[in-house]
Amino acid sequence: MTQPNDAAKPVQGAGRFDIWAPEAGTVTLLAGGERYEMGRRPGNGPADEGWWTAADAPTGADVDYGYLLDGDEIPLPDPRTRRQPEGVHALSRTFDPGAHRWQDAGWQGRELQGSVIYELHIGTFTPEGTLDAAAGKLDYLAGLGIDFIELLPVNAFNGTHNWGYDGVQWFAVHEGYGGPAAYQRFVDAAHAAGLGVIQDVVYNHLGPSGNYLPRYGPYLKHGEGNTWGDSVNLDGPGSDHVRQYILDNVAMWLRDYRVDGLRLDAVHALKDERAVHILEEFGALADALSSEGGRPLTLIAESDLNNPRLLYPRDVNGYGLAGQWSDDFHHAVHVNVSGETTGYYSDFDSLGALAKVLRDGFFHDGSYSSFRGRCHGRPINFSAVHPAALVVCSQNHDQIGNRATGDRLSQSLPYGSLALAAVLTLTGPFTPMLFMGEEYGATTPWQFFTSHPEPELGKATAEGRIREFERMGWDPAVVPDPQDPETFTRSKLDWAEASAGDHARLLELYRSLITLRRSTPELARLGFADTAVEFDDDARWLRYWRGGVQVVLNFADRPISLDRPGTALLLATDDAVRMDGVQVELPPLSAAVLRD
């Protein structure tokens, strides 16, 4: 059931069937096996244009329904469908979000600053691959010290398994994960465990199968595409309704499902030339809902533009978002622990790049990018942005999964190198994000997988993936077929690893680092001006200060000794670390956190 500006409000088992179909000549509702002719909704204002209504149809929960446009015989699913129990091509089913009896009345939410995020994919996080099964791991995550769980997209897609970025029904939760009721249970359980939930959402494109939005109206800009297909119509004719559709989806997650924030996928692909960018509207809506609900709500943008305007307040022409990803941190860490310098890693081949990121947030803040062949980014105004607004990681779903074989750092690097990456991520000035399994050095890959039922689409996806890496010099024989079910199965975590050998040792280090971060305010609370960095590229060491806390890292394959060791050893990644009043000694591939 769809009602303009109202999709995110609980229906409480009643309502009416409304649909926006401005180009249709006739619209028929098929509900509960009966047909109802719809009429144009009364009203002369722009908000009423193109809307059809069937006020006499039976309403309530668990009614199967769809729409027939211009005499069609096959009904289309609702663009705002909450449930698709038989798949994205089938009838929609009504769902009453108000039926869930929430148990989280005492939940006050969490602020981004000072928090640690854990990114996970429901389908591969547990053997069962469901929301209910993932809820069984919440105590583990709370014990690790996590504050926010960030879920990869859960909206409905065609097939049984997918990363989630091929979603076509933004208001529906994938039935294979348990559907919308399971999602509510998961959020409720997360809050009971003291964990916030951030939902990854995709508003820059729709998937290749099951996208019926163009049948209803000008949701897309045909011929104006991005990497994934036609762009969403944010600024053309009819875009007022399209924008409201998206804003209602934002409100649905934050209000109906009580999530604590959204991760906004690839906002650089949101083509919006209107005076008020839709990201600004997102920020204003989140602030309003935060005031209404009495808890913080966090919007985090994924952007490769290195543009701090995303974070600046709206009253100074910013978008007012709480955070954005910083790929530069990932690249600098990856190069210095792995030695890879190809492709977009080429500009980060020194400890100097890592030092600049730690000091300034971005490496490319107006500097020349050899990978792009042009200057890139702009500097951050330190008086307007706290370092915690930058979300950083040493691994994430993109940076692992978009490698040819989906290999993690832990599949090729020793404990010492993984420990260096962990220390940089969890003691640096930014908000750290872990990718599922990283904390124990998972050796299961995270590969690109799909399950398109259409043979031609599946074949095209697999061939395109192989061609992409063949152009980069990879042997096509080593690139996994995304349509092979084994590619999905291989990507599931093996939780038995977490208790064995160096896996258990690394897991204990992550717990200790998160505990130290929480108990040492300088690590998470100080601003950009409170970070100082020294390094020696030839000797391969780097150290930085956050107020009265010093972090020393040895990237070399030989021991080092440095002066000014501080007064107390707070944490070491290796038992062979030694310090006295004169020097601190670090074995190869090790780090220490010191109190000055």
Curated annotation (Swiss-Prot):
The organism's place on the tree of life at top rank: Bacteria
Pfam family, one: DUF3459
Localization, UniProt: Cytoplasm
An MF annotation (GO) of this entry: 4-alpha-D-(1->4)-alpha-D-glucanotrehalose trehalohydrolase activity
Its EC number(s): 3.2.1.141
Site-annotated residues for Transition state stabilizer: 398
UniProt similarity note: Belongs to the glycosyl hydrolase 13 family.
Protein name: Malto-oligosyltrehalose trehalohydrolase
Native organism: Rhizobium sp. (strain M-11)
